[in-house]
Amino acid sequence: MMTALLRCCGKGYAFSVINMANIVTCKTKDGETVQYVDEVIGSGSMKDVYFSPDKSYVVAFYHKPQNEQARDRIDMITGRYRQNIFGQSGGEYWKDLFCWPTHVVEHGHKIGIVVPTYKSYFFFKYGSKNDDFLGIKGREKEGKWFASASNQNKFLDPRERGNTLTYLKVCLLLTRAVRRMHAAGLCHSDLSYKNVLIDPEMGHACIIDVDGLVVPGKYPPDVVGTPDFIAPEVVKTSHLSKEDPNRVLPSITTDRHALSVLIYMYLFFRHPLRGGKIHDMSDEVRDETLSMGEKALFIEHPTDKSNAVKVSQLSSFSLPWADLEKIPYTIMGPYLTPLFERAFIDGLHDATKRPTADEWESALVKTVDLIQPCQNKACEQKWYVFSGKTKPVCPYCGTPYKGKLPVLNLYSSRKEGSYRPDDHRLMVWSGQSIYAWHVNRLIAPNERTTDAQRKRVGYFVFHNDQWWLVNEGINGLMSLPDKRQIAIGEKIELTNNAQFVLSKEEGGRLVVVQLVEN
């Protein structure tokens, strides 16, 4: 017996305990044999869910008969669209980032889908505080648990909360998944913390509830989204009929808004639009519609402070995260800051200006390379993004950096012997690694990265009051200007203004060291 704690196929499940009831065997539409234990383990607004005997997948049957268009969409999602994503080069990579239906099954006048069960790290290992007083240990890590400072501080065991580095990894994976979905011409339409699972402890993420994906112009959305994540133009026109040409429905551009909100919430644990401004004191529904729609305003707008959060009205559980003076969005560094501005200032009411998932992915990759461990061992966040200042300070606990801090400025070749700045830096800390994508600009860390490219090729170490790069697998490592070859197994010292070549191939990198001392 075990408690069923899946939510991969609908909303608001009531869960029950599995008894080993009858095992039902049936065929999928494409001829595969599937089995399920004939006892409902989860029932939501759309489906009833059953475990397979080995619990490696679930079978979810829709409550209501599906019309022809809905059946066609399910067939396409489990068929062609799934093949286009998982059947391509690097397709295996996406199995960890999507809980994607694999088959359609019809049995006893019911239609359903077969969906993989969640990975073990998407279930709470420790649960809530005070010996799991909420009883959530073993339940799935729905993204909403982690999206507000108040939720985390009030309820979650500190071991479940993660830190700045793991949340950057979570955001990177979510962004990568959305990028792939959009590249296939699909949009989620309900991208929110209710439809993602995240594991902040290790930095995992997965998009769920994909059986309702929207194909613009072919399959319309079943829902307009989840409050907090619906784009302002969708909220603003929600009173209009779906047939009205002025009605804005979910699309890839509205997904971009939802993705930006998710990233902001997972990095700052607050909502970018929920501030102190009230638009209608007498009508709460109208006030909400204006705040999230026509009158939506970034709480950190640089010139219009009317929606700024009123710190005096905040619960202590929300602090310091809700205090915009202490933790502004700019602490995330030079790559994410302009994207937040495009998402919530320039693009909030102009969808064409919103950052794409590709742009978020690129900025997050560069930001992860700017991460620096806090020297205060008691710092809850443990890491922070290097600000570019000569006297860096952890924005979370206020601890200044002490000692020598090497920053590697990356340049790459467009033609042999000619290097241009890449607007990309790599912070150095003891144990920090160099990978193939640092050696060569033409290699990107994504689903196409080979196993060989995922292996580190060098690492940094602080020894005898000096910083060193140890060469583990860089064949072309060469110091300048003496052009001395640094063989595998040897090391090169990182001194101020030192230069060395990582690769002379096309796209190969040149490094210029900047040494900050405090």
Regions found by a protein language model. Name each.
Residues S479-N518:
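C-terminal boundary/linker segments immediately following FHA domains
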Residues K194-H239:
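Activation segment/activation loop of eukaryotic-type protein kinase catalytic domains
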Residues I263-T337:
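Conserved C-lobe activation region of Hanks-type protein kinase-like domains
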Residues V407-Y459:
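N-terminal beta-hairpin/loop module of FHA
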Residues V178, H182-P200:
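Catalytic-loop of the protein kinase fold
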